[in-house]
């Protein structure tokens, strides 16, 4: 801080320690769709595990008590022998008996390696939640675009399952990007949903172009996004979940298609490789 800022009573809240009881006032933007649910500690019994892809494992936990969460939120999982919890988005819909998690194995990652190699059915797993403000703005009642990369599918899956279960009748589109067909998962689930819900469209996209039997979309997700609706995204709400490079490319495409910050909601997936890069808003967004 500069001396004049100290004289004005300003502090750096990120490194200040309260010495007594205090009252904090803050300007917080209220969202009519936000549910302020209490955090709680849970212990779940592992009901099922499955290799969704060669690098992504599905884990289904039965919590020891009902868990309330908004579709799109995540939990913190405490892994034995690993310092600090790890965050995993919930893939199941609110109200489901089981909590579904998608865990991508990170090279050299102690936590994800343990969850892939050691965790087994009937084990007990501690977790805490729910966290995050990544949720569907249902009050908007307009076209929803879900854009996911890899295991970033978890939050969008929960969100669209929730919307369809509630009878949303506006267009809902899911773009899911994967490197190859082996890394694409839950395709059968989404194809079944397209049969049951005429307003739902599923667009799987493979970035690897070496599969001669693949007749679906290829390239990067943002490239396929450009061709959707002739590149005009006005009147939509977009929800993006995945690695930061994919998020930034898709934000640029959406904004070029006249969809702006207030209608674009993101959740970035970081790994140990991203540790040196602080989490931040998209440089394309003006609001701090």
Task: Annotate the PLM regions.
Residues 72, 152, 243:
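Short, conserved phosphate/pyrophosphate- and ester-handling motifs at nucleotide-, phospho-/glycolipid
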